[in-house]
Amino acid sequence: MGVRDEIRKILPEVDLIENKDLREKVLSTWEEGLKRGGWRPLDIARMPFTLLKPVKISFADHVRSVTKVCLAVAETFDEIYKGALKLNRDILLAGALLHDVGKLLEVTETGGTFKKTKEGSLVRHPFSGLALADAQGLPAEVLHIIATHSKEGDPYKRTAEAIILHYADFMNFDPLEG
């Protein structure tokens, strides 16, 4: 099984992206992040999604949950608001799947312990994730979601998709005990 197939198995929501070119760029970004970070795809299923508090939720599970929350919000808005709020579902999905991809460069494992890399101490994951995605040719709308999803994006106006992702991400972080 190739790296992309492994990524698809761990993050099956990638296949919900209808635009093939966008889907391939999302996979390329994950592939490059894994390579540069020295990870294998299966590592994201055991890597913690945060080092800020001791939770037993994997990076992969966090990304999947955030993505599913975003999709549920988009579907609910479409059903209830009947198109009054135009969302780009593929852009939202790509942003959700990639919002934390920079953590592949922010975290390392030494002797079974996960810790920040030197790079991760200097450049937080919204910035490294933006760089990874930009290098793979992701559109500006996805780059915007990655860049503004965390506190770094607070001073800026977010698109509707970026707002949904921002709150979905914090819904999957703030309530967790640590």
Question: What positions do the PLM features span?
Answer:
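Divalent metal-dependent catalytic cores for phosphoryl transfer on phosphate-bearing substrates
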Residues: F49-L52, D61, V73, A84-G178
